[in-house]
């Protein structure tokens, strides 16, 4: 699975949220100023080439659907992120965000609750 560019990732997030869509639907999801239709169409073509979306021809346009689940993408690239930036230590990652004041004490409690629930299952 290839890593997506920032633009591709943004478009892919819209496709995941829409579940199936035309390029015009994706363009409509952007805030003003919206990118040109042709730019979004080009990005979607790249996503199709990379295997992230499937296209079904309907008349003279295409209906796009995700070919890769969002959870699968997250699992693959978050694992790489933790490996590359935090020596494969999730503890180091959480510590970093806590020190940078990106996580509150309540956030950390929620994380602990999630971990404990995961152990029970």
Predicted regions and their residues:
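Short acidic, hydrophobic short linear motifs in intrinsically disordered regions
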Residues: 21-30
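Short, hydrophobic-biased segments on the C-terminal half of alpha helices
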Residues: 41-45
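Short, cationic-aromatic polyanion-contact patches
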Residues: 4-7, 58-77
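Pre-recognition alpha-helix immediately N-terminal to the DNA-recognition helix
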Residues: 9-14, 25
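Glycine-centered, phosphate/nucleic-acid-interacting loop/turn motifs that mediate DNA/RNA or nucleotide
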Residues: 51
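Amphipathic alpha-helical dimerization/coiled-coil segments
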Residues: 77-120
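Short, locally clustered residues in the helix-turn-helix/winged-helix DNA-binding domain
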Residues: 13-20, 98
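Short helix-coil-helix linker/hinge
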Residues: 2-7, 20, 87
């Amino acid at each position: 699975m290839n890593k997506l560019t920032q633009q591709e990732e943004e478009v892919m997030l819209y496709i995941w949220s829409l579940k199936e869509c035309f390029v015009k639907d994706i363009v409509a999801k952007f805030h003003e100023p919206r990118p040109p239709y042709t730019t979004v169409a080009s990005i979607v073509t790249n996503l199709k080439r990379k295997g992230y979306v499937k296209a079904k021809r309907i008349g003279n346009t295409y209906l796009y659907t995700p070919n890769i689940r969002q959870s699968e993408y997250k699992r693959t690239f978050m694992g790489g992120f933790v490996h590359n930036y935090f020596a494969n230590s999730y503890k180091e990652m959480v510590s970093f965000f806590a020190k940078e004041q990106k996580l509150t004490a309540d956030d950390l409690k929620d994380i602990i609750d999630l971990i404990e629930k995961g152990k029970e299952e």
